[in-house]
């Protein structure tokens, strides 16, 4: 199992696959599957049948999960992809840190 260092709300860039080079915000992290769902990336057309709650059926675009190894975190200060590491602060809190800029991530 891959260690998950990317969190919901992070800006990431796809580094391999059909959407290589595209950037988006992580909507959901599926830790048990080592996958993430990124807004606007890996879209698939799904046919939806009309039901009582949603009268209109039809074809919708839906984001499908991408493996965590196929995305990289985008550093907000340099706007380049970077790796993430964990560091303990003086008050014993464990925080995520950008390796490129050394900036503490939220």
UniProtKB/Swiss-Prot annotation:
<dbReference type="InterPro" id="IPR005825">
    <property type="entry name" value="Ribosomal_uL24_CS"/>
</dbReference>
<dbReference type="GO" id="GO:0003735">
    <property type="term" value="F:structural constituent of ribosome"/>
</dbReference>
<keyword id="KW-0694">RNA-binding</keyword>
<dbReference type="GO" id="GO:0005840">
    <property type="term" value="C:ribosome"/>
</dbReference>
<dbReference type="InterPro" id="IPR041988">
    <property type="entry name" value="Ribosomal_uL24_KOW"/>
</dbReference>
<dbReference type="GO" id="GO:0019843">
    <property type="term" value="F:rRNA binding"/>
</dbReference>
<dbReference type="Pfam" id="PF00467">
    <property type="entry name" value="KOW"/>
</dbReference>
<comment type="similarity">
    <text>Belongs to the universal ribosomal protein uL24 family.</text>
</comment>
<dbReference type="InterPro" id="IPR003256">
    <property type="entry name" value="Ribosomal_uL24"/>
</dbReference>
<dbReference type="GO" id="GO:0006412">
    <property type="term" value="P:translation"/>
</dbReference>
<comment type="subunit">
    <text>Part of the 50S ribosomal subunit.</text>
</comment>
<dbReference type="InterPro" id="IPR008991">
    <property type="entry name" value="Translation_prot_SH3-like_sf"/>
</dbReference>
<keyword id="KW-0689">Ribosomal protein</keyword>
<comment type="function">
    <text>One of the proteins that surrounds the polypeptide exit tunnel on the outside of the subunit.</text>
</comment>
<protein>
    <recommendedName>
        <fullName>Large ribosomal subunit protein uL24</fullName>
    </recommendedName>
</protein>
<comment type="function">
    <text>One of two assembly initiator proteins, it binds directly to the 5'-end of the 23S rRNA, where it nucleates assembly of the 50S subunit.</text>
</comment>
<keyword id="KW-0699">rRNA-binding</keyword>
<keyword id="KW-0687">Ribonucleoprotein</keyword>
<dbReference type="GO" id="GO:1990904">
    <property type="term" value="C:ribonucleoprotein complex"/>
</dbReference>
<dbReference type="Pfam" id="PF17136">
    <property type="entry name" value="ribosomal_L24"/>
</dbReference>
<dbReference type="InterPro" id="IPR005824">
    <property type="entry name" value="KOW"/>
</dbReference>
<dbReference type="InterPro" id="IPR014722">
    <property type="entry name" value="Rib_uL2_dom2"/>
</dbReference>
């Amino acid at each position: 199992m891959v260690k998950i260092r990317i969190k919901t709300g992070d800006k990431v860039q796809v580094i391999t696959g059909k959407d290589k080079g595209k950037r988006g915000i992580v909507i959901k992290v599926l830790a048990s599957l080592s996958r993430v769902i990124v807004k606007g990336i890996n879209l698939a057309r799904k046919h939806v049948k009309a039901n009582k709650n949603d009268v209109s059926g039809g074809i919708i675009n839906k984001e499908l999960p991408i493996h965590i190894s196929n995305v990289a975190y985008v550093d907000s200060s340099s706007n380049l992809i970077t790796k993430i590491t964990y560091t303990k602060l003086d008050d014993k809190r464990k925080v995520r840190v950008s390796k490129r800029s050394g900036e503490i991530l939220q």
